[in-house]
Structures are given as C-alpha cells and as structure tokens.
C-alpha cells in the first residue's frame, strides 16, 4: 500500500502524463535522443545485451532508447497513466519492453537481477530516497552499475529563482501544459521531501552509508 505522499505524487504525474509523453516523444525524434544515448552508452559496462532496469521510467524515454540499442529493458513507475504513455511509445516502435507498475522504494525483483539500474529525474520526487537507493543496489548484479541522472531541483524552489521563468509552449524540451496550479503543487511536494536539501552532498552522505 502506498503512502499518502506517494498518492499525491502519483496524482500530480497523472495530470501531467499526456503532455509529458509528448515532450519525451519529441526528444526521441530529434537530436536530444541521440545525445542521451551517447551519454548513457559511454557509462555502460562493456557488454552486449545488458539487462537494464529503468526506475521511474515515466513515459519510457530511457527504456525505448536502450531497447532500440539492443538491450533487454524493463521499466517501472508508480503512475499507471505514465506507463500507458510508455507502452504506446514502445508499441509505435515495435519494441518488446516490459513495463510494470511498481514502487521504486520497494522493488519486487530478486537480488542481483540486473546489470544496470538507471533513473532520470526520479530521486528528487521520492519520500524515502535512501530506501530506494538500497533497493537499487540490492537488485544489481555483482559489478553492476547504477546510473542516476538527477539534480538539485529543490534549489529553484528554495530560491524562487524560477518564479518568473517562462518556457515557450512549443519548446521541444519545455514543460508543456505546466499550469500555475501544477507548478505550485510541484513546489509544495518538493519542499516536503527529505531530499529537498543541498545535492549532490545529500546523496553522497547516503551512498556512503549503504
């Protein structure tokens, strides 16, 4: 059973799922997708056909990129509406990707199941990110790699530096459909999180404990 905060987060991303899917589809179809693939492949173990877990897959951007590159990918997310967008994206490209509704903080996989666990823009949304980190390491095979692409997004909320920043509605990488109400909800959720502290210093302290 998910917590009240997780329900709030899931509701927020449900409201954004369709527009978010449009942004990620746009990225897959332009140079951004190839830039991301090159960056990820530079960090991957030197092995073909890796078994990869995309945690917080959202609309399946990383999962699709890596499946197209020949890897065996599974994507998980807490938000069913996001997963529907991901399945649609994969089906449009005839890709066989397993997408599951799952809590990133309580994985249902056995230990040492994956060569790589990767995530993008997820840890800052988690109520218990330290628990999530422990789970991700648990399902990694010996010598496996954890790739976490994230940022100190709470810094913008703390400083209000983004208050007057407007993104053009047709921007391919912008937050299409991001209303003032959704922005306020995003800010309020962010400030309640343990991870709403200075990063990556917070992450480094946690990772040293694991």
Q: At which residue positions do the language-model features occur?
A:
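Class I SAM-dependent methyltransferase SAM/SAH-binding core
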Residues: 51-55, 59-106
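Conserved class I S-adenosyl-L-methionine
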Residues: 1-48, 61-62, 145-181
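A short SAM/SAH-binding and catalytic strip from SAM-dependent methyltransferases
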Residues: 116-129
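Short alpha-helix
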Residues: 177, 182-183, 194-210
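A short acidic, Gly/Pro-enriched loop at the edge of an enzyme's catalytic core
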Residues: 105-116
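A short glycine-rich, Lys/Arg-flanked "PGG" loop and its adjoining helix->strand segment in the class I
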Residues: 130-145
């Amino acid at each position: 059973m998910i917590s009240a905060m997780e329900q709030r987060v899931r509701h927020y991303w449900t409201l954004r799922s369709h527009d978010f899917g449009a942004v990620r589809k746009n990225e897959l179809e332009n140079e951004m997708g190839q830039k991301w693939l090159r960056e990820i492949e530079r960090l991957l173990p030197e092995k073909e056909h890796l078994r990869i877990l995309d945690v917080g897959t959202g609309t399946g951007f990383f999962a699709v990129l890596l499946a197209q590159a020949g890897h065996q990918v599974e994507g998980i997310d807490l938000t069913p509406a996001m997963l529907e967008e991901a399945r649609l994206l994969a089906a449009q490209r005839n890709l066989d990707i397993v997408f599951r509704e799952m809590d990133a903080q309580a994985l249902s996989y056995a230990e040492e199941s994956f060569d790589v666990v990767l995530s993008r823009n997820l840890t800052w949304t988690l109520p218990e990110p330290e628990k999530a980190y422990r789970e991700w390491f648990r399902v990694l095979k010996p010598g496996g790699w954890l790739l976490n692409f994230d940022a100190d997004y709470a810094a913008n909320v703390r400083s209000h530096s983004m208050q007057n920043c407007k993104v053009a509605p047709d921007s391919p990488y912008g937050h299409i459909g991001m209303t003032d109400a959704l922005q306020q909800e995003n800010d309020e959720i962010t400030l309640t999180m343990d991870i709403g502290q200075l990063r990556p210093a917070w992450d480094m302290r946690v990772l040293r404990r694991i």
